[in-house]
Amino acid sequence: MSSLREEELINILPKDGPTVEEVKKYLEKYNDEFIIIKCGGSVLVDPKLFKVFIEDVVVLKKLGFNPIIVHGGGKRINSKLLEVNIKSNFINGLRVTDKDTINIVEDVLIEFNKEIVEALNELDCKAKRITSKENNIITVVQENKDLGFVGRPTGINKEFLTEIIKANKVPVIAPLGLDKDNQTFNINADTTAGSIAIELKARRLMIISDVEGVLDSEKKLIPEINSKKANELIDQEVISGGMIPKIKNCLDVASNGVKAVVIIDGRKNHSLLFELLSDKGSGTLIRE
C-alpha cells in the first residue's frame, strides 16, 4: 500500500510502537482500504489517552490508510445531565432519551466532535466534522417508543463520505442522525460504526474501549473468536451484561461484508497501531 522509505517510516512511527520491520510487512497486506475506528468516550475523556489516540490516527493517515472515526461520549453526557439534574436511564444498554435529554446529548457530542477535529488539524491532519447539524450522513428511524429519541440507522450517505476521503480528509462522525422530518436522534456509537463499516465494506472495524477485549472464564484475553464460540460463551454467561450487545453487534458486522471486527484496549499505548501493524496484535479479533 505505502511506498514510504525506511527513513520516512522511522520519522512517522512512535518509538514505543510497532517496529519498522513489522510495519513494512503489514503495510503490504493493505490496499487503500477503509478502517473504521470507533473510540469510546470513556477512553477519550483521559487527556493522555486522547493525545495518543489522535497521534495514532495521524500515523495511520501518513502511512496511507483511510481512517474514519466514530466517537462516543457517554461519560461527558452523563456528567452534563447530572449538572442539570436529569437522571440517566438505560434499557438494554441504550440511553432513554426524552426531548430535554436529546438536546443535551446533541450539544455534548457536537462539542466533542469539534475537539477531535481540531486536535487532528493541529497535527496537520485534515479532518471533517460530521454531526446532525453539519454534513449529516445518517438517516434513522426511531428504535422504539420506550427509548424516545434513540434511532436506528436506515441509510448512510456513502457518496458524501467517499468524497471526504478522496479529498484526503479524515471523517469524524458523531453518533447522531436525522429522521425524515429532520428530527435529531441519538444512536448507539457501536451501531453507528457498524453501519458505516458495512456500507463501505471496510477491511476492519476497530472498537477502542476501556476493556482488554473478550475474556475467557479465567479472565484471560481471547485473541480471536467466531460466532459459534461467542454464542457458547454467552450461553455459559462468560460473556455477560453490556458485553453481550457489543459482541452481537460485532458478529452482525462481521457477517455483512466486513472482514473482521477487533475490540482493543484504548488504555494501552498505541493499541491501534499494534493491532493493525504488528505480529502480536492487540485485543480480540472477531470473525463470522
From Swiss-Prot:
Molecular function in Gene Ontology: acetylglutamate kinase activity; ATP binding
UniProt record, GO biological process: arginine biosynthetic process via ornithine; L-arginine biosynthetic process
GO cellular component: cytoplasm
Cross-referenced Pfam families: AA_kinase
Swiss-Prot/TrEMBL keywords: Amino-acid biosynthesis, Arginine biosynthesis, ATP-binding, Cytoplasm, Kinase, Nucleotide-binding, Transferase
Reactions listed under catalytic activity: N-acetyl-L-glutamate + ATP = N-acetyl-L-glutamyl 5-phosphate + ADP
Amino-acid biosynthesis as UniProt keyword: yes
Top-level taxon in the UniProt lineage: Bacteria
TM regions (residue ranges): none
Residues that bind substrate: 73-74, 95, 186
Residues at the site labelled Transition state stabilizer: 38, 246
Pathway: Amino-acid biosynthesis; L-arginine biosynthesis; N(2)-acetyl-L-ornithine from L-glutamate: step 2/4
Subcellular location, record wording: Cytoplasm
Chief place where the protein resides: cytoplasm
The EC number(s) this enzyme carries: 2.7.2.8
Function: Catalyzes the ATP-dependent phosphorylation of N-acetyl-L-glutamate.
PANTHER family from the UniProt entry: N-ACETYLGLUTAMATE SYNTHASE (PTHR23342), N-ACETYLGLUTAMATE SYNTHASE, MITOCHONDRIAL (PTHR23342:SF0)
Protein family membership: Belongs to the acetylglutamate kinase family. ArgB subfamily.
UniProt name for this protein: Acetylglutamate kinase
Source organism of the structure: Pelagibacter ubique (strain HTCC1062)
Primary gene name: argB
